[in-house]
Curated annotation (Swiss-Prot):
Pfam families according to UniProt: AAA_lid_4 (PF17864), RuvB_C (PF05491), RuvB_N (PF05496)
Keyword Cell wall biogenesis/degradation: no
Protein name per the record: Holliday junction branch migration complex subunit RuvB
Gene Ontology terms: biological process: DNA recombination; DNA repair
Cellular compartments annotated: Cytoplasm
Source species, domain of life: Bacteria
Cellular component per GO, a single term: Holliday junction resolvase complex
Gene3D superfamilies in alphabetical order: 1.10.8.60, P-loop containing nucleotide triphosphate hydrolases, Winged helix-like DNA-binding domain superfamily/Winged helix DNA-binding domain
Family: Belongs to the RuvB family.
Gene transcribed to yield this protein: ruvB
Species whose genome carries this gene: Christiangramia forsetii (strain DSM 17595 / CGMCC 1.15422 / KT0803) (Gramella forsetii)
Amino acid sequence: MMNENLDATGENFSPEEFDVERALRPLSFDDFAGQEQVLENLQIFVQAANLRGEALDHTLFHGPPGLGKTTLAHILANELNVGIKITSGPVLDKPGDLAGLLTNLDERDILFIDEIHRLSPIVEEYLYSAMEDYRIDIMIETGPNARTVQINLNPFTLIGATTRSGLLTAPMRARFGISSRLQYYSTELLSGIVERSSDILKVPITQDAAIEIAGRSRGTPRIANALLRRVRDFAQIKGNGKIDIEIAKFGLKALNVDAHGLDEMDNKILATIIDKFKGGPVGITTLATAVSESAETIEEVYEPFLIQQGFIYRTPRGREVTEHAYRHLGRVKGSNQGGLFDN
C-alpha cells in the first residue's frame, strides 16, 4: 500500500489536505523556489505576451509528480492576470466535455489539463483545431439532419501537464510552443520550502530539522510539505509544538521514511528484486504482481526516484538493482539471504 505521505501525485490526499496544500502553494514567480531556468524563461514569455496583449503560447510541463506543474499553471494565470479553468485528461470523455470548457474561456484565459497524456484519441484530435486555429466544429442534431457548425473561440492558452511525456502523440507535442521539464529539487532548496511552509502553518522549526525533512522528501516539494504536516502532528502530541531535530527524526521513523527518503514500498521493491529475482532483470508486470502494486504506480511514483538515486536501472530485459541497493538493504550480492519482506 502506498505511503500517503510520500504520494507525490496527491491522489490520496483528503479534502483537508488539499486545502492545506493550496494554502502552501506559491502564487507568483517571486514565491516559487527552484527550477531556475524554467522560471527565467517563463518570466520572459509572460512579459512578452503581456506587452503584445496576446495569449501565451500553449505550454507543456512534464516531469515527475509533485514538482510544481499545477502550481506553475496557477502562477502563470496570476502573472498574466487571466482566468484559469482546470480539468484532467481522464475526465474529458467526449468532445462535448471539452467544447463546454473552451467556449467559456475569455480572451487570453488558461485551460489547464492535468494528465494530458490520458486524453482519449477523439478528444485529442478535437483539440487540435482549437489549439491551432481557435475554432471547433460542433455537430448539431443527429441522423439525416446532422450538420456541423463551426464556432470561433477566444484566443486562449492550453497548459498541459504530464508525468509521462513519452506517451504524448507527436501531433500533440508539436502544438506546444513552450515545453519545460521540471527536475527534482536539491535538499538545500527543499529545506527553504519547508521553512517557508512552517511559517505559513505557524509551526516553529529549527534549521537542522528542516534539512532533515528535506533530505527525506525524494527531491519533491509536495512530499516535503506532506512530511512537514505529519511531523507537526508528532511535535504537537509527543513534543512541545516545536519541530526540532529529535522530533523530526522520531516522526520520520514512525512514518517509515528512511534516511534516503525511501518508504516501505520502495524498500519492498528493492528487496523483491533481490530476493525473488536474484537482483533482476525482472519485467514491470511481474514486479508489480510480486509487490501487489500497479505497474503504472511503480513507473510513475517509485521508479523515477529509485533510478535517479542509483538503486535500480532499466535494461531491455527488465529492471535490475545496483550495488547501491544491496548495500542499502545490507545484502550480499549472490547470496540467498532472506529479507525483511519474506513470508
